Each structure stands twice: as structure tokens, then as C-alpha cells.
UniProtKB/Swiss-Prot annotation:
The keyword Acetylation does not apply. Keywords: Cell junction, Cell membrane, Cytoplasm, Cytoplasmic vesicle, Hydrolase, Lysosome, Membrane, Metal-binding, Nucleotide metabolism, Zinc. This is Adenosine deaminase. One of its GO terms (molecular function) is zinc ion binding. It is an enzyme of class 3 (hydrolase). It catalyses: adenosine + H2O + H(+) = inosine + NH4(+); 2'-deoxyadenosine + H2O + H(+) = 2'-deoxyinosine + NH4(+). PROSITE patterns: A_DEAMINASE. GO terms for cellular component: anchoring junction; cytoplasmic vesicle lumen; cytosol; external side of plasma membrane; lysosome. The gene is ada. Binds 1 zinc ion per subunit. The lineage of its organism: Eukaryota, Metazoa, Chordata, Craniata, Vertebrata.
Length: 358
């Protein structure tokens, strides 16, 4: 296991597939498909796609333009990034991961507009999900960890959301466990009812729900996620603490916050001083939250970076890390029987199995 700050089994709930691709894989498919990259060595490519000092969220999102054309619209590439993702997480000591992505961003057919300036091809969002599932399942068998997926709606593309929820339903028993909403938080659901309708359908069909909210946006976005979209978890949620009443209500309801410390620094989502990070407040209040990488390719990170920040700047102890991972497992979108199995694995690894006297 790679992690040094917490060298025990971990659970990760907030990480993007398209932000977790190996640079070598990007270069391989760019060459194979004759797609021009900003550089053709790993070091050169990382200079363009990875960074270490805070940028705005918009500048961060522009990083994807450099490399996604090499991966999107290629069956082998889509399967491979899913497989290699599981390999990467296994090396980090993760035993259960929920990975999220927008099927439309990897497609080149039956998607409007076609992303990344691709020519029209024959890979639909539906086939993308099937390809990712194949890669994840193969990775699970090879690396002996459990991986599930979350399909993302994009705030600026409400016309995609009805298909996202249909794909969640179609693949509900085949790695897909939930729906997510990502993108520009200033685009609310009042103006873009496509998302609200998709989430209403999710509630009706028993599909789990998480929403990116309060990352750079105000607490009102979190409120909308909970009240309108019926979110069961909040992606990031840092700015929730600015509305004491909302924060108190979410604490009382045991709402789970998917916290990504290093990401929040590099996207300027939070104060650059980690001692002032909302996670320190969450920790103090014994809130329900997890620690996650978000986009490790772009942030040049592993899960150990986030755990190290929590130790060095926020004073987290090993017992608190155990609690964080147990909360992550409890808040995972696994069916109850699989959740119990996961929790048992953690309790066992953490030396927390109590003798029942049987």
C-alpha cells in the first residue's frame, strides 16, 4: 500500500475517472490515433495538465481540453482508463471506490454537442457506460478491490440529464450506483429544470443521489441540492458552514460531505491556509465526511497527499482516519448486504471487531 499517512484500507467516494488517467495512456492513444497533444513526453504533458499552485475552477477545467481528445471516442481507451483506475486505487490501499464520470464527455455519437471537437463517430453514451463497466469489472478481478460508478449530469448541459438517469436505471445492477450533478454552480436548477426532472426520476426509481455543491458556490447551492434534488451526499460542501442554520440541519441529519482537501486548495475553493479549512470544522463537529482525491492526474496527487494534509495541517489522528473511512463506508451507495461486508472488512483491518461471546 502506498499511503503513509494512513497505512490501512480506505474507502474513496469522490474521484473523477477523466481526472485520473495515466499520462502514459494519454500519450499512447494520442500517438495511435494521431491526435496532437501539447507535448509527447510524460514530463512535458504534465507541465500542461498538472499544476501545484491555486488556479480558478474555470482555469482548472480548461486542463481537460489538453488530453480528453486522445481518450474520448475510442473503445480501447475508455476500457483501459477504467481498468487502470482500479489498479491505481488498489495501489493506494483503497478497498472500495465510487468513481464518477459523464458518459457524454467520452462519447462521439448521439451526443449534442459532440465534445472536445471530435468528429462524429459511433460510440454513444450508452456504450461508454458499458465499456467503463467492463474495465472496472476486469480491474476488480485483477486487483481484488470493489469499484462502483456514478454517472454525472453537467450543469451546463441539462439536455443530457434525462439520458443520464435512464443509463443509471439501465446499468443499476452493473457497477452504476448513483447519479451526480457537476459543473458551474451558478447555473441553478430553477433555470435548468432538466436536472430536477432527472433527480425526481432517481428518487422514484431508488437511484442514489450526490451533487457537487458549495465547492466554490454559496450555501444556497447546497440547500437546493438537499431540498430540490434530494441529495443524499454533498460533493465538497465547504461553503455550507457559512450558513449556520443549514450547516446545523445537515449535521443533525448526518449528511455526508465528500471532502477533497488538496483539490480545494488548487481550485481556490477554500482559504489557502489548511488550518482554516472547513474540514477542520467538520472534524471538530464530528460531521459525517470522507477524504478524497477528486482529480489526481491534474492535481499531481494520490490519496496519501490528502491524508498527509489532514495529518500535518489539521491534526487528524489514526483513530479519526478510521472514523472517516467507516463513515465513508456507511455513506457509500452499496446495497445494505455489501455495505455490511465492507464495514466488516474495515472493522477487522482496524482491530475493531468486538467479541460477541459466540
Amino acid at each position: 500500500m502506498e499511503s503513509k499517512a494512513f497505512n490501512k484500507p480506505k474507502v474513496e467516494l469522490h474521484v473523477h475517472l477523466d481526472g485520473s488517467i495515466k499520462p502514459e495512456t494519454i500519450i499512447h492513444f494520442a500517438k495511435k490515433r494521431q491526435i496532437k497533444l501539447p507535448a509527447d513526453t510524460v514530463e512535458g504533458l504534465l507541465e500542461h495538465v498538472s499544476y501545484k499552485e491555486p488556479l480558478s475552477l474555470t482555469e482548472f477545467l480548461q486542463k481537460f481540453n489538453h488530453y480528453m481528445p486522445a481518450i474520448a471516442g475510442d473503445r480501447e481507451a475508455i476500457k483501459r482508463i477504467a481498468y487502470e483506475f482500479v489498479e491505481m486505487k488498489a495501489k493506494e490501499g483503497v478497498i472500495y471506490v465510487e468513481v464518477r464520470y459523464s458518459p457524454h464527455f467520452l462519447a462521439n455519437s448521439k451526443v449534442d454537442p459532440i465534445p472536445w471537437g471530435q468528429k462524429e463517430g459511433d460510440i454513444t453514451p450508452d456504450e461508454v457506460v458499458d465499456l467503463v463497466n467492463q474495465g472496472l469489472r476486469k480491474g476488480e478481478k485483477t486487483f481484488n478491490i470493489k469499484a462502483r460508478s456514478i454517472l454525472c449530469c453537467m450543469r451546463h448541459m441539462p439536455n443530457w440529464s434525462s439520458e443520464v438517469i435512464e443509463l443509471c436505471k439501465k446499468y443499476q445492477n452493473d457497477t452504476v450506483v448513483a447519479i451526480d450533478l457537476a459543473g458551474d454552480e451558478s447555473l441553478n436548477c430553477e433555470s435548468y429544470p432538466g436536472h430536477r426532472k432527472a433527480y425526481e426520476e432517481a428518487v422514484k426509481c431508488g437511484i442514489h443521489r450526490t451533487v457537487h455543491a458549495g465547492e466554490v458556490g454559496p450555501p444556497s447551492v447546497v440547500k437546493e441540492a438537499v431540498e430540490v434534488l434530494k441529495a443524499e451526499r454533498i460533493g465538497h460542501g465547504y461553503h455550507t458552514t457559512e450558513d449556520p442554520n443549514l450547516y446545523k440541519e445537515l449535521l443533525e441529519n448526518n449528511m455526508h460531505f465528500e471532502v477533497c482537501p488538496w483539490s480545494s486548495y488548487l481550485t481556490s475553493a477554500c482559504h489557502p491556509d489548511f488550518t482554516k479549512h472547513p474540514a477542520t470544522q467538520f472534524r471538530k463537529d464530528k460531521a459525517n465526511f470522507s477524504l478524497n482525491t477528486d482529480d489526481p492526474l491534474i492535481f499531481g496527487s494520490t490519496l496519501d497527499v490528502d491524508y498527509s494534509i489532514a495529518v500535518q495541517h489539521m491534526g487528524f489522528t489514526e483513530d479519526e482516519f478510521k472514523r472517516v473511512n467507516i463513515n465513508a463506508a456507511k455513506s457509500s451507495f452499496l446495497p445494505d448486504n455489501e455495505k455490511k461486508e465492507l464495514l466488516y472488512k474495515l472493522y477487522e483491518a482496524y482491530g475493531m471487531i468486538l467479541s460477541t461471546g459466540l
